[in-house]
Amino acid sequence: MSTISKATVISVKEHGSEIREYMLQLDKNYYFEAGSFLLLTLDIKDSYSRWPESRNFSIASAYDESGVIKLIIKKVGAYTSRIFDELQVGSKCVVKYAFGDFLLPFFDKKAPICCIAGGTGIAPVLSFCEQLRRDGIQDRFHVFYSFKNKEELLDLTTLQSIVPLKQLHLFSTRELLEFIPNRRIEWKDIITENFNFQKTHFYICGNESFTNYFKEQLEGVGATNIYTDEW
């Protein structure tokens, strides 16, 4: 059952002109699984007979008793432009959560987890990071993450502090950065890790072409645990 809660913006961090990281304090805080998404509306009411216009965003943090959640929002249309204009520190909005099936495996606590993320598709992966560290099983975690430039490199500190060093693979597509390949993620990058494709859990999050490409490649080698989250 979903929860409707007012939320207050407690911090805003800009990553260039088109991406922002929002920290929200929920009025009503209930447990949600890492990888879930929510609906955010700027139409603030005490109750709704019909849910108003909204946009969905992956929750970029794991559940916390403090009721603080993180969202990563990219300005891509009229409504997200409104969010950028209207949501500042101290502003309120309403969220409806939690939804989705892009979730960590419930019954398998040992097989590797490989996340392939492009751009703001890193959001649910960040929630996985926090949850796996909390569960003490982050050693099974592999992350392939591509981003445009240093400004749009999201939450590197979290990734580096949780994902084992040799299992964190970063790619900068539009800016030459030290020690980071200046290109997109390629299929050869996945293959060279020698995953057991029948046992590893693969999570792909990015735009449609990004997601379809890696899904097709994984299916082609017999991968059986593939989860996608397109945007």
Predicted regions and their residues:
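FNR/FR-type flavoprotein reductase catalytic core
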Residues: 2-3, 76-231
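Ferredoxin-reductase
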Residues: 2-91, 147-149, 174
